[in-house]
């Protein structure tokens, strides 16, 4: 209602922003919220007015909840960078920049650690793996591709990774395979996985997973 500005000032000192100002259609509520928002903006704080029909406000509140839930999930995520990050300048990002943007931690893992796991061989017989094997693809090629999958799964467990990116083309010469099948399986399992050492694509996929709970896939 009107006249809550001084009350808001006393409360806001005890709470961190951003601030969401829920209004009604009477008692000068919107005008009071606009005055508070102007104060916040003048002091470098973030705020938003929620105004409209109950269904419109309910939709806004749901979106706010989803965004804050996603931010909380991202802040606890460990994102694996296997091998050197790709040389493309548009794909480069520093650990500090990622941490500042979403709170996630970049974890560097040497390529040789992945290679050692691939040579070790083996993979879990998941539902996705079983479905691939039933397609009747060349057995030798499937074994090579799934060895990469098993290796990446073990790295995820060892380093507590929630997402990863890997230099797939570095697998071609020593193993005559790529990471495409492995990354597809990981994405389907809820582990965002990007190729070419592309950090920004990995972070984008992690953000989309945190927001929607749905898997993505990195196109060329």
Kindly give the residue locations of the regions a language model identified.
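An N-terminal assembly and electron-transfer interface module characteristic of large anaerobic redox
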Residues: 1-220
């Amino acid at each position: 209602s009107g006249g809550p500005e001084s009350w808001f000032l006393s409360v806001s000192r005890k709470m961190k922003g951003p601030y969401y100002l829920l209004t009604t259609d009477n008692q000068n509520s919107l005008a009071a919220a606009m005055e508070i928002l102007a104060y916040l903006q003048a002091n470098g704080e973030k705020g938003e007015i929620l105004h409209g029909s109950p269904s419109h406000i309910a939709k806004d509140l749901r979106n706010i909840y989803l965004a804050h839930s996603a931010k909380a999930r991202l802040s606890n995520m460990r994102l694996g960078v296997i091998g050197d990050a790709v040389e493309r300048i548009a794909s480069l990002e520093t650990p500090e920049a990622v941490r500042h943007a979403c709170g996630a931690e970049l974890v560097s893992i040497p390529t040789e650690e992945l290679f050692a796991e691939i040579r070790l061989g083996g993979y879990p017989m998941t539902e996705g793996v079983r479905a691939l094997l039933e397609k009747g693809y060349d057995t030798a090629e499937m074994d090579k591709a799934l060895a990469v999958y098993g290796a990446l799964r073990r790295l995820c467990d060892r380093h507590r990774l929630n997402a990863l990116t890997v230099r797939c083309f570095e697998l071609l010469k020593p193993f005559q395979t790529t990471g495409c099948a492995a990354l597809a399986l990981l994405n389907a399992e809820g582990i965002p996985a990007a190729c070419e050492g592309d950090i920004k694509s990995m972070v984008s996929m992690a953000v989309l997973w945190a927001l929607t709970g749905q898997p993505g896939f990195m196109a060329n």
